[in-house]
Amino acid sequence: KIIGIDLGTTNSXVAVMESN
């Protein structure tokens, strides 16, 4: 899993993205 900061949404926060 990749943990990053999502600044592209109005609800900015920490996003957890699945990487294949």
Curated annotation (Swiss-Prot):
This protein's name: Chaperone protein dnaK
Keywords noted in UniProt: ATP-binding, Chaperone, Nucleotide-binding, Phosphoprotein, Stress response
GO molecular function, one term: ATP-dependent protein folding chaperone
SUPFAM superfamilies: Actin-like ATPase domain
Induction remark: By stress conditions e.g. heat shock.
UniProt miscellaneous comment: On the 2D-gel the determined pI of this protein is: 5.7, its MW is: 46 kDa.
Gene3D superfamilies: 3.30.420.40
Naturally occurring in which organism (per UniProt): Naegleria fowleri (Brain eating amoeba)
Role noted for this protein: Acts as a chaperone.
Family per similarity comment: Belongs to the heat shock protein 70 family.
